[in-house]
């Protein structure tokens, strides 16, 4: 047995103050440093740049360091441990701190504190004896007997540990090689002891006292291990398993305690799981995987982290609806009535749902279609999906995809990762409990993309009827049949949907509502819903249709009805205040009547409170019911109108025309303004325009320059070269909104023609269409939304490309009756329709028509 090599520490040591841990000589401890003095000590004495200094510290236990260095030091513990920092790791979260790995060297005693700031420094005296231990044992028999007794208990403890034979032999060699005088400190830091017991061992300067205090701790640990071995069930692989070197860090339990009851419950749960696996209707491949996992679970200790993961996996497998489904309601007549009651208009969408029901009647094993409702916000795309599920009698589940940027949200995480879980598809199936629900994939056009993968690519398999019968979630790692699920996606635009994903879905356009449709929706659905939410009845409030029309035209500007619904909510809140005040006034009037009757017999005291008299005098009658919401009440509640019809005012001078634009929020009218000035022939474009729109402007000016003589268009100097010493500025108002697309071509031509001819464009005309350099008008998209926007703005005539005439069939008949349409195949027809009296070709005087 070797002896301790002499350790000599400096007489002055910087002090590291710890509170919740005790460091013993020969042991290693990890501690966190976050107080002012300790941080200053680490930065000044341990760290030099990025390197670690070999500085001996004095670790003082059971002494909290004040949070501020302005506070005085608390009383210091008398005995500490000289230590060497092995590792220092810094961090700034949640606050600046260091984590130190320190090794104890020897004991010392504080003689005098030399300074307290910026960190404490003390004069110390080393306490551990440096004499050779064998020489001490020869001179003192009691110390030698204690040493031998301690060694025997230490060997017995090592042999009782649940470790392999080689590991036990290695620990035996370690005990033999360690100095005997170091064993009490080292084993005390390893076995289960409290900080109070460790502090007592630290204070035991004498070796005899140290051995005497440590032996009972070893005996207690040995008895606990014996009790644990009696209560444990023997296993075949006990001799092969290896646990951590630190022995038994938990209190041994007694038979019949809560731990035994929990173990019995776990065993019962495993039996139930095994029974569910045998009786489940899962496919053969999934059944094989579950049987294999349940066998692993039986052999696995409950303390292993993988035990809970495997159990959760098996519980999910038996809960999934592999073959459980609901029966569809295929009554087309009842479905039509239900859809009409829930939603007004949307004829195209309702027809597609009824077609699906009809085909399901003829073919039971029809694969679910993949529908995608595309339209502006607030038109009812999400609520239609819920109505479809209600019509079919199926379960409904909504999956919000807006902002999802991790493909694991769709496919799940592999079970090798910590915190793994299935994807949203499998989770949704577990939630609804059937394999043929209606899944609403909301906002599919707002999927993101990140380093974790592309969720839109993960949806390709889900939304492909030819592949989704074999969908494999990463967490399950077995195939699940999604062919019976009816997937409905919603989007505001198809522009941001990847082409491969768009190709897998059947696009159904859901356009915005007309004013008449909004009025019907308001009085059928919105107003009754708001009355119910605010506790009102139709006998208390009356909103005529002309008031609803005023709200639609002057307080909202949208394709859907969300803002309209909020306006009705504001009206109902204002009426609720009036109704509540009226009930309060009625009660006060009743009380005042009673007081007046009694006042005939009594005199009013002079010191009566004036508030009660004035309150009674100022009482007003409650409002008459029902409260009528007219234009005056509308202005009081909602304030001044937000939108005004300013079309005629803005077209009061040449160089202004009205175009029609399409946005994901629906159609809208767009003004185009032009002005000319002396310059060098430059064309300036403003209004946040895209490249396509800029090219349309250059096309328009080129066509007008080439046809200037034909229409007798001149600049301010009378020249047919429109850009000769002239600059042109084209502006598209709402400059904060980005604009792009080819459909503004005809509007730009009309605006510039008005500028150079000095004629006004008709104030009731709007137009849309793409142009070519030869003056042709090409078709554009979004005709229905654009026409509805023009109708909302009060325009009367719409100029559209001739090849878009077929799109007029989708426009409601009442809108078509209010508007007149001009279909144009070339710019000549556009100009003739945009100006009063047409835009005739100017013939050059003095020319004689040849008859040859």
Swiss-Prot record:
A motif (Microbody targeting signal) lies at residues 850-852. ATP binds at residues 375-382. Residues 651-837 form the Lon proteolytic domain. It is found in: Peroxisome matrix. It catalyses: Hydrolysis of proteins in presence of ATP. GO terms for cellular component: cytoplasm; nucleus; peroxisomal matrix. One of its GO terms (molecular function) is protease binding. InterPro entries: AAA+_ATPase, ATPase_AAA_core, Lon_bac/euk-typ, Lon_lid, Lon_proteolytic, Lon_Prtase, Lon_prtase_N, Lon_prtase_N_sf. One of its GO terms (biological process) is regulation of fatty acid beta-oxidation. Residues 13-222 form the Lon N-terminal domain. Keywords: Acetylation, ATP-binding, Hydrolase, Nucleotide-binding, Peroxisome, Protease, Serine protease. Its EC number is 3.4.21.53. Signal peptide: none annotated. CDD domains: RecA-like_Lon. The active site is at 743, 786. SMART domains: AAA, LON. The modification N-acetylserine is found at residue 2. Belongs to the peptidase S16 family. ATP-dependent serine protease that mediates the selective degradation of misfolded and unassembled polypeptides in the peroxisomal matrix. Necessary for type 2 peroxisome targeting signal (PTS2)-containing protein processing and facilitates peroxisome matrix protein import. May indirectly regulate peroxisomal fatty acid beta-oxidation through degradation of the self-processed forms of TYSND1. Interacts with PEX5. Interacts with TYSND1. May interact with enzymes involved in beta-oxidation of fatty acids, including ACOX1/AOX. This is Lon protease homolog 2, peroxisomal. It comes from Mus musculus. The gene is Lonp2.
């Amino acid at each position: 047995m070797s002896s301790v090599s002499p350790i000599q520490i400096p007489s002055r040591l910087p002090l590291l103050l710890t509170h919740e841990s005790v460091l013993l000589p020969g042991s290693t401890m990890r501690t966190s440093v976050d107080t002012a003095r300790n941080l200053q000590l680490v930065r000044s004495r341990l760290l030099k740049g990025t390197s670690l200094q070999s500085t001996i510290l004095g670790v003082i236990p059971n002494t909290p360091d004040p949070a501020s260095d302005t506070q005085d030091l608390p009383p210091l513990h008398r005995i500490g441990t000289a230590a060497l920092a092995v590792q220092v790791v810094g961090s700034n979260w949640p606050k600046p701190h260091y984590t130190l790995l320190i090794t104890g060297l020897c004991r010392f005693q504080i003689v005098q504190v030399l300074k307290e700031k910026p960190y404490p420094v003390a004069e110390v005296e080393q306490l551990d004896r440096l004499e050779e231990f064998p020489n001490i044992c020869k001179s003192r028999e009691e110390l030698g007997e204690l040493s031998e007794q301690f060694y025997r208990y230490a060997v017995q403890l090592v042999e009782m540990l649940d470790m392999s034979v080689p590991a036990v032999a290695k620990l035996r060699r370690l005990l033999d090689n360690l100095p005997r005088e170091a064993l009490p400190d080292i084993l005390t830091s390893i076995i289960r002891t409290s900080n109070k017991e460790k502090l007592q061992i630290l204070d035991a300067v004498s070796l005899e006292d140290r051995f005497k205090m440590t032996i009972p701790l070893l005996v207690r640990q040995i008895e606990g291990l014996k009790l644990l071995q009696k209560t444990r069930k023997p296993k075949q692989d006990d001799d092969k398993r290896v646990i951590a070197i630190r022995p038994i860090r938990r209190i041994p339990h007694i038979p019949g305690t809560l731990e035994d009851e929990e173990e019995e419950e776990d065993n019962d749960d495993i039996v139930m799981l095994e029974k569910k696996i045998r009786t489940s209707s899962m496919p053969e491949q999934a059944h094989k995987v579950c049987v294999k996992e349940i066998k692993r679970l039986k052999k696995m200790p409950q303390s292993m982290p993988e035990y809970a993961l495997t159990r959760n996996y098996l519980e999910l497998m038996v809960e999934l609806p592999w073959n459980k489904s609901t029966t569809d309601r295929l009554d087309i007549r009842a479905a039509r009535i239900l859809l009409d009651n829930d939603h007004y208009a949307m004829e195209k969408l309702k027809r597609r749902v009824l077609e699906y029901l009809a085909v399901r009647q003829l073919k039971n094993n029809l694969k679910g279609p993949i529908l995608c409702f595309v339209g502006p916000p607030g038109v009812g795309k999400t609520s239609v999906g819920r109505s479809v599920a209600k019509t079919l009698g199926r379960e409904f589940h909504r999956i919000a995809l807006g902002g999802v940027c991790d493909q694991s949200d769709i496919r799940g995480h592999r079970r090798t990762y910590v915190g793994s879980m299935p994807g949203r598809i499998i989770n949704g199936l577990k939630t609804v409990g059937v394999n043929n629900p209606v899944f609403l994939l909301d906002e599919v056009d707002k999927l993101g993309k990140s380093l974790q993968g592309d969720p839109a690519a993960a949806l390709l398999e889900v939304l492909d009827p030819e592949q989704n019968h074999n969908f494999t979630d990463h967490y399950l790692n077995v195939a699940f049949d999604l062919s019976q699920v009816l997937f409905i996606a919603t989007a505001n635009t198809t522009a941001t949907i990847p082409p491969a994903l768009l190709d897998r879905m059947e696009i159904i356009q859901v356009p915005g509502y007309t004013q008449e449709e909004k009025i019907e929706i308001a009085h059928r659905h919105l107003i009754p819903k708001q009355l119910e939410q605010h506790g009102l009845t139709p006998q208390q409030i009356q909103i005529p249709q002309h008031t609803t029309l005023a709200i639609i035209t002057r307080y909202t500007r949208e394709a859907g009805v969300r803002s309209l619904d909020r306006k009705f909510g504001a009206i109902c809140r204002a009426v609720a205040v009036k109704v509540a005040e009226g009930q309060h006034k009625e009660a006060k009037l009743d009380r005042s009547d009673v007081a007046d009757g009694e006042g005939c017999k009594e005199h009013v005291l002079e010191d009566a409170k004036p508030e009660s008299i004035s309150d009674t005098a100022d009482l007003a009658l409650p409002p008459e019911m029902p409260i009528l919401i007219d234009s005056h009440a509308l202005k009081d509640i909602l304030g001044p109108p937000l939108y005004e019809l300013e079309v005629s005012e803005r077209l009061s001078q040449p160089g202004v025309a009205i175009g029609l634009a399409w946005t994901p929020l629906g159609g809208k009218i767009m003004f185009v303004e032009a002005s000319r000035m002396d310059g060098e022939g430059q064309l300036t474009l403003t209004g946040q325009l895209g490249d396509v729109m800029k090219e349309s402007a250059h096309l328009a000016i080129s066509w007008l320059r080439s046809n200037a003589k034909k229409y007798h268009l001149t600049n301010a100097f009378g020249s047919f070269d429109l850009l000769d010493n002239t600059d042109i500025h084209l502006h598209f108002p709402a400059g904060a909104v980005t604009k792009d697309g080819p459909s503004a071509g005809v509007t730009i031509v009309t605006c510039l023609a008005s500028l150079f001819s000095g004629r006004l464009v008709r104030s009731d005309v709007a137009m849309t269409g793409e142009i070519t350099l030869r003056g042709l008008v090409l078709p554009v998209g979004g005709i229905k939304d654009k026409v509805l926007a023009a109708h909302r703005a009060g325009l009367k005539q719409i100029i559209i490309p001739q090849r878009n005439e077929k799109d007029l069939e989708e426009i409601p008949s009442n809108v078509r009756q209010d508007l007149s349409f001009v279909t144009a195949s070339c710019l000549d027809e556009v100009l003739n329709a945009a100006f009063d009296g047409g835009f005739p070709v100017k013939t050059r005087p003095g020319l004689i028509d040849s008859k040859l």
